Amino acid sequence: SSSPQKMVSYDDDLNSRSSVDFEKGEIEVEVIIEDTPGKTSQQSQEEGEIALEKKLQKVITLPAPDNQPILKDQIADGEGGSISPKTSKVFAKKVVATEAVQKSNITAKDGKPRVKYSVTIKMVPNHIEIRAKRFKANILKQSKRFKIDPAIVFAIIHTESSFNPKARSHVPAYGLMQLVPKSGARDAYSYIYKRDKLLSAQYLYIPVNNIELGCAYISKLRHVYFGGIKNDESAYYCTIAGYNTGPGNVAKTMSGTTKLIANANAVNGKTPEQIFKILSNKLPYVETRKYLVKVLERSNYYRSWLKM
């Protein structure tokens, strides 16, 4: 099933499936061919390979909201170049001819025998960085506009969606920064535009909208909810945790109450190291504790990456 880091799609007849893992950098395509009487295994194989080629080509050329393929420059042709929509057909043919195509016999729910063919290919090793570069100008622009640390924005996007603009979670949260229409997106929109609006998934999938709102939400956490915190490092620890679990849970962890003034006082009396220790051990959800650590590690990486 799909997750923010993994895009799974089925064709209408459910006879083919593709899965793109944006975290691991793997693309898997599978097709199911009916094993009709009189069909030789050679015919079945040919049919399976043609269907695999078509499905693989479809995945490689799938457009992002900016109409560029989502996987642009992320698949190598094996000869030092990268695959474009123009070369995708030839590439798909080559992959199916040369890679290890897995074959297995299955019996479907209707009792009919079928053959499943699948193939897996790897993206280039720096696929995450390539996607990050695509949104870099916009992230820097909005970080500056909202007075927030861009390295933290990159780290949050990496952790939320691995820079998959079509990311969707079960919540559902949408897009690069995994915004929830009823909470984070709504809060951010009213922070910028001073009016209440429930935004559609379609709106949130568009990277410029998503980055604008995500950065605005980080800004509101940093400068409004946690604006009373004097130390920048401590305030960002609270902001990162708040992005994942909401400011109320952070305040409760720090001061036993959701009152932000009490939270600021509790935080201001301690060092950033103490704040980190409390949050990473006492936040109500293990997921948020892990999230804080991951985002901080990645923000160090992006801080040096942005200087390159």
What are the language-model segments listed below?
Residues 1-158, 223, 227-229, 256-308:
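Cell-wall glycan-active module
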